[in-house]
């Protein structure tokens, strides 16, 4: 059997709250879980997960915002699993997942710059040709001088043998893959809204 070394993700919850925790509420009243914290080294995030506990299809909505992420912080996760390293910066990510027990749709928008991928062999040495090909098909910036958001919509199917958090991760991975691929027709661009 081939063994895989585990990748490491670090999530620290700073604050959290739950409202309407009971099966006595009637639709459309929803249970709402709100959390904020730190992802990996110092990336702030917040999330709002809502669902109707009486809905037999387990319909839910998960809204999240992830702040500035140095992509090199992700290498402790990516290198053991994928024999890859990344660098660059995701300035902001916003996403909404609407789904049920079986399938979901994620809408994700991201601002990013200077993205670069290095593919590695088993000895963790760079595969130069494959790395060059990978970088040729990736978006390295979301727009000139960071003035564009990349928006993407994609889907995920749930593996019923795994947890909701595996399902959430699958949505995010699918969304990020679509967003970073240059030649994918589902990606659209729009001007970033000016912050007040």
Question: What residue ranges belong to the model's regions?
Answer:
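Elongated, acidic membrane-bridging lipid-handling scaffolds
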Residues: 1-60
């Amino acid at each position: 059997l081939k063994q895989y070394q585990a990748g490491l993700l670090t999530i620290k919850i700073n604050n959290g709250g739950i409202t309407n925790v009971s099966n006595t509420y009637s639709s459309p009243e929803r249970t709402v879980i709100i959390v904020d914290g730190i992802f990996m080294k110092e990336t702030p995030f917040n999330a709002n997960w809502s669902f109707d506990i009486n809905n037999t299809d387990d319909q839910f909505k998960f809204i999240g915002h992830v702040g500035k992420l140095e992509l090199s912080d992700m290498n402790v996760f990516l290198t053991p699993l994928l024999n890859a390293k990344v660098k660059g910066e995701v300035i902001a990510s916003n996403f909404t997942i609407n789904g049920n027990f079986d399938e979901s749709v994620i809408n994700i928008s991201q601002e990013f710059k200077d993205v670069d991928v290095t593919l590695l062999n088993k000895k963790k040495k760079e595969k130069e040709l494959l790395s060059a090909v990978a970088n040729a098909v990736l978006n390295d910036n979301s727009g000139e001088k960071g003035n564009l958001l990349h928006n993407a919509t994609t889907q995920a199917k749930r593996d019923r043998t795994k947890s909701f958090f595996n399902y959430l991760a699958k949505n995010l991975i699918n969304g990020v893959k679509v967003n970073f691929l240059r030649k994918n027709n589902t990606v659209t661009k729009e001007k970033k809204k000016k912050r007040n």
